[in-house]
A protein has these predicted regions:
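Acidic/His-rich segments in extracytoplasmic proteins that coordinate ligands and/or metal ions
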Residues: 1-48, 134-153
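His/Asp/Glu-enriched short active-site or ligand-binding loop at hydrolase and phosphoryl-transfer sites
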Residues: 107-127, 147, 177-180
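Extracytoplasmic/secreted envelope proteins and their assembly/folding machinery
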Residues: 17-20, 45-52, 61-65, 69-72, ...
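Loop/turn elements at helix/coil->beta-strand transitions in domains of secreted/extracellular proteins
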Residues: 3-6, 26-31, 51, 82-88, ...
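Soluble non-cytosolic domains of exported or imported proteins
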Residues: 13-17, 38-45, 59-62, 66, ...
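Structured C-terminal subdomain patch of bacterial secreted/periplasmic proteins
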Residues: 38-56, 60-62, 67, 145-187
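Second-shell loop/turn segments in exported
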Residues: 6-10, 32-38, 49-62, 94-101, ...
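Basic- and aromatic-lined ligand-binding clefts that recognize polyanionic substrates
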Residues: 60-114
Length: 187
């Protein structure tokens, strides 16, 4: 039988998805982690300090965060004078709709800080914007890179989901990247 000291969860604001009311009702201690609402990449990383506090590891978290900030700023400086940024788009379609990160999202900020030209930087907001597949194909067909495609282990898996993915130049050139390093050493 489990008897946790604390359960960390997130809250969406939608009763059908949130588990914390039931957990609290069951007498369990709950803390809400809202890191996913943070649009600044370093702000998201700083939530590690919040988690560290529950383990009395604040000093270690502060040190790691400070090192991360320094590395991040160094990386930004490396591309700050880039004259021809690469073009990039993100994500994949889900049930026929492509949820593209808004131009103020942490994904858009990460790409800009990396010296990339995010094809959808003009989308309003920090959340994902629903787009038709055809709209994405029209705007991103010639993009240099495609990131954040999910937990794919091989490129051909994308085409197995939707053959239209093969129409993207990034797919044809093999410049498609997942966010999961757990799959291969290169991500």
């Amino acid at each position: 039988e489990l008897n946790p000291d604390l359960i960390m969860t997130s809250a969406s604001g939608f009763a059908e998805y949130d588990s914390h009311p039931q957990l609290l009702e069951a007498g369990l201690s709950v803390v809400i982690n809202s890191d996913y609402l943070e649009y600044d990449p370093l702000g998201r990383a700083e939530w590690g300090k919040f988690i560290a506090a529950f383990f009395d590891k604040e000093a270690e978290a502060d040190k790691l965060f400070d090192e991360m900030v320094a590395r991040y700023e160094e990386a930004k400086a490396l591309v700050s004078n880039q004259t021809e940024p690469v073009t990039v788009f993100a994500n994949t379609a889900y049930e026929g709709t492509w949820y593209m990160p808004g131009g103020e999202s942490y994904i858009a900020i990460l790409l800009a800080d990396a010296g990339a030209d995010y094809v959808f930087k003009d989308l309003e907001g920090s959340g994902a914007q629903p787009l038709d597949f055809e709209v994405v194909l029209e705007r991103a067909k010639d993009a240099d890179f495609w990131v954040n495609v999910g937990a794919m282990t091989e490129l051909k898996e994308l085409a197995g989901i939707d053959a239209r993915y093969e129409d993207f130049e990034a797919y044809q050139q093999g410049k498609v990247y997942t966010y999961s390093k757990r799959i291969t050493a290169a991500g």
